Regions:
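Active-/binding-site microenvironments in catalytic and ligand-binding cores
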Residues: 1-314
Length: 314
């Protein structure tokens, strides 16, 4: 079952993921990078060699300063943007609770625990969750990535593969769909790749304005077997425009099944709520789905993540 025989992950298989795909200790007891360790000097040089058209494409959504009309639960805590306009200058203040389903951000490895900390839950690399304090995280925080994330990005454009505007809610993206897409566009996965999965977020919401939003939402997205693809190919991170699929073939013992494995066990960062629509058009026009990807998290000491503006370079 799972990726190998192209069938949805069972409950038993999902439970095994936490040991099968654990990277605890793989890069030493002091590791703070997780799967970003897969990004070698050679991988960065390879990515740099992909820049020959002189094009740059943002993969971010605008910071959301308002609730969504008629669907307020999609952004229950809008960003606070205040202008300060003087006689000869201007400035502004921005405050944002960036985790959720609207703002483009990267999750640090302190964001998700293996379970309730009062019942033995741990952080990535078997660290004590009490190291995450009200003053900030003392380990696994986003400021360990202050030098930026630079690697080859690969767009997995699943709506394009299915000739759809967006992925159907009852047809989750599975690991073998990523395999099929890569083969169809001539991509050979490389260790350190940023796997960027497009579901067609904007098109979905345009067509489903009154779709009932819950937490987690029942939107289209990715099934747990995607975890197998990431691990087997030594991916450095997963980026997505829509996150876990709301439709699940089985009742997994997890609220957000992919988050709950890849962050605390695998040590893999997640680029949440990206926008890959313009990137999709650029990949189609250039005839290639690989590019240099640059992500520069804010240096937030003890931060659980950061708003980001990922840039794809061709």
């Amino acid at each position: 079952m799972g990726l190998q025989d192209r069938t949805p992950t069972t409950v038993e298989e999902y439970a095994s993921y936490k040991t099968r795909f654990s990277n605890w200790g793989r890069w030493g007891e002091d590791d703070q990078l997780g799967t970003l360790n897969h990004i070698t000097d050679d991988q960065i040089k390879y990515a740099a060699g992909l820049i020959n058209e002189g094009l740059s494409v943002s993969c971010a959504n605008p910071i959301a300063t308002e609730q969504v009309v008629g669907n307020q639960q999609r952004n229950p805590r809008p960003a606070d943007h205040r202008m300060m306009v003087g006689a000869d200058s201007s400035g502004d203040y921005v405050g944002v609770a960036f985790h959720g389903y609207v703002n483009t951000h990267i999750d640090a490895l302190c964001h998700i625990f293996t379970g309730d900390s009062s019942m033995g839950g741990r952080l990535y690399n078997d660290r004590d969750p009490n190291l995450v304090t009200d003053a900030g995280a003392l380990t696994n925080s986003v400021d360990y990535w202050k030098d930026g994330i630079v690697t080859r990005g690969v767009l997995y454009d699943i709506p394009a593969m299915r000739s759809q505007e967006y992925v159907s809610p009852d047809e989750p993206i599975e690991g073998w769909h990523l395999e099929d897409w890569a083969e169809s566009v001539g991509i050979q996965p490389r260790p350190g790749d940023a796997v960027l999965v497009r579901s067609g977020c904007d098109a979905f919401w345009r067509a489903n304005e009154n779709f009932e939003f819950s937490h987690p939402p029942a939107t289209p997205g990715n099934g747990p077997s995607v975890i197998e693809y990431l691990y087997d190919n030594d991916a450095s991170l997963l980026g997505w425009d829509l996150q876990e699929a709301g439709y699940k073939h089985f009742d997994y013992p997890a609220r957000i099944p992919i988050h709950e494995v890849v962050i605390p066990y695998m040590g893999l960062p997640l680029l949440d709520n990206a926008n890959f629509d313009e990137l999709s058009l650029t990949c189609k026009s250039t005839g290639r789905y690989e590019f240099m990807l640059v992500i520069s998290p804010l240096v937030i000491r003890g931060g659980t993540g950061s708003p980001v503006n990922p840039i794809a370079l061709f």
